[in-house]
From Swiss-Prot:
Residues at the catalytic site: 64 (phosphoserine intermediate)
Name of the gene: gpmI2
Family: Belongs to the BPG-independent phosphoglycerate mutase family.
Enzyme Commission identifier(s): 5.4.2.12
Swiss-Prot/TrEMBL catalytic activity: (2R)-2-phosphoglycerate = (2R)-3-phosphoglycerate
InterPro entries: Alkaline_phosphatase_core_sf, BPG-indep_PGM_N, Metalloenzyme, PGAM_B_sf, Pgm_bpd_ind
Record's protein name: 2,3-bisphosphoglycerate-independent phosphoglycerate mutase 2
Species of origin: Methanosarcina barkeri (strain Fusaro / DSM 804)
């Protein structure tokens, strides 16, 4: 009979940052008897989870993709944002053959170039200077028909930052060529990642058919009208920007038409660099066997992805992935360990794809468990999300005695934190606390151990103290790392997210591969 395994668990609280001040701090406000007890009884430390510690520009907040990638890699990896910034600075961006091919296609067909993506300075899914660089490039190449399809943020920026962003973008367009904003749409629609295809279809139809819930004479008015309807940036319904129809210098009775829609032979550059929320609308454009919704129109276009969104798609990629060798999952597999990755829908890609170095592949003896996220409009309506279901399932898996290593993500503090609803975020923290209490009790019975940490901050800063408005973005605050288990380990040193994987390997008695430059957090006597 095979001896039952005593698992090592890596438990990631998405959005669990540390901030001393209690005002606007859902983590400090919540009743968390289990976490309080763990922090009192167990060794713990702080980890840097933002900026240069995770391969981002100095001072930039972390995010889930970057956090999980860094945790799994065991090293600091220059993130796509940083890679693209460097290419702009050294000029390689403007010589990128994929961009140049898209421009050549437009010139050869006398067609249009469409630049679509999140028009945000947040730096999580996209970065406004990248769009600016594209506009400078097309100005240099003297393209006449250039259109922007602006997705609005409201999560990685304040809920009403888009109006100012759009004004600045409009001014930049006037200074650098003649690009026009053709549509605006909240990311809730254009960047859904949970196969809520009705949302994606609204954005897709706006881009391809010029059909949307609303129209406006310009992008600034589109955003202002949305605010008047009670919509914040994330939830702005797709809106077509229209222009008056002039025939023989006379304005016709029909009065207006869309500024532009995506047509056959056009080029499209999707300038988001983060994959998870770029996939669905990309699939709608490029997949022959797409079945998410009925496409009334499917234009044949030259479609460029800024980075690799889906390795199964044969599309041009401006910045292809850099392969990471010997990430945590690979090392565990090579040593014959059986591992489990478990999360709900919102963070499933993070404990699989991103933790595995940005690759879809599943390693030998790597089991995966997806718990569906609740089908609701916003997670403040159900702050516990699917945490209780995840906990029930992971306890069952622990008790099975099958696994050596279990990686679990609780999405609550991040996803509810993004809503900006303080009371809901407090409930989210309390739900996770109940879950961790149950899990560590079972681990204790089985002789298991756990590292409990986070990928970035969020719920600890729910109010912008300068404006008094809800704070919906991530933070650059440090995160905690708690060790639960073997009493021989007395202390952890402060470190970075890249130190988590080397710590796990030391706990398992596995040599750290040379590619991992992070260092174990365990303090030796």
């Amino acid at each position: 009979m095979t001896q039952a395994r005593r698992p090592l668990m890596l438990i990631i609280f998405d959005g669990w940052g540390y901030r001393e001040a209690k005002e606007g701090n859902a983590v400090m406000t919540a009743r968390t008897p289990n976490l309080d007890r763990l922090e009192k009884e167990c060794p713990w430390c702080f980890l840097k989870a933002s900026g240069e510690a995770v391969g981002l520009p100095k001072g930039m907040m972390g995010n889930s993709e970057v956090g999980h990638l860094t945790i799994g890699a065991g090293r600091i990896v220059n993130q796509d944002l940083t890679r693209i910034n460097i290419s702009i600075k050294n000029g390689d961006f403007f010589k990128n053959p994929v961009f140049l091919n898209a421009i050549s296609n437009v010139k050869a067909n006398a067609s249009s170039l469409h630049l679509m993506g999140l028009a945000s300075c947040g730096g999580i899914h996209s970065y406004m200077p990248h769009l600016h660089a594209l506009l400078k490039l097309v100005q240099e190449k003297d393209l006449k028909k250039v259109y922007i399809h602006a997705f609005l943020d409201g999560r990685d920026e304040p809920p009403k930052a888009a109006l100012g962003d759009i004004k600045k973008l409009d001014a930049f367009c006037k200074e650098h060529g003649n690009a026009k904003i053709a549509t605006v749409s909240g990311r809730y629609y254009a960047m859904d990642r949970d196969k809520r295809w009705d949302r994606t279809k609204l954005a897709y139809d706006a881009l391809t058919r010029g059909v949307a819930p609303y129209t406006a004479p310009n992008a600034e008015t589109a955003v202002s009208n949305a605010y008047s309807r009670g919509e914040t940036d994330e939830f702005v319904k797709p809106t077509i920007i229209t222009e008056q129809v002039i025939t023989e210098q006379v304005i016709t009775e029909q009065a207006e038409k869309p500024v532009a829609t995506v047509q056959d032979n056009d080029s499209v550059i999707f300038f988001n660099f983060r994959a998870d929320r770029a996939r669905q609308i990309t699939w709608a454009f490029v997949k022959d066997d797409f079945d998410g919704f009925m496409r009334e129109k499917r234009p044949e276009v030259y479609f460029v992805c800024m980075t690799q969104y889906d390795e199964t798609l044969e599309v041009p990629i401006a910045f292809p992935p850099i392969k990471l060798e010997n990430v945590l999952g690979e090392v565990l597999s090579k040593h014959g360990l059986i591992q489990l990755r478990i999360a709900e829908t919102e963070k499933y890609a993070h404990v699989t794809y991103f933790l595995n170095g940005g690759e879809e592949k599943r390693y030998k003896d790597e089991d995966r468990c997806l718990i569906p996220s609740p089908k609701i409009a916003t997670y403040d309506l159900k702050p516990e999300m699917s945490a209780y279901e995840i906990t029930d399932e992971v306890i069952r898996r622990i008790q099975s005695g099958k696994y050596d290593v279990i990686v679990l993500n609780f999405a609550n503090m991040d996803m509810v934190g993004h809503t900006g609803i303080f009371e809901a975020a407090v409930k989210a923290v309390e739900a996770v606390d109940k879950c961790i209490g149950r899990i560590v009790e079972v681990l204790k019975e089985k002789g298991g151990v756990a590292l409990i940490t986070a990928d970035h901050g969020n719920a600890e800063e729910m109010i912008d103290l300068k404006t008094g408005e809800p704070h919906t973005a991530h933070t650059s605050n440090p995160v905690k790392c708690i060790y639960f288990g073997n009493s021989e380990i007395k202390a952890l040193r402060n470190g970075k997210l890249c130190d988590v994987a080397p710590t796990i390997l030391e706990l398992l008695g596995i040599p750290k591969p040379q590619e991992m430059t992070g260092k174990s957090l365990l303090v030796k006597d």
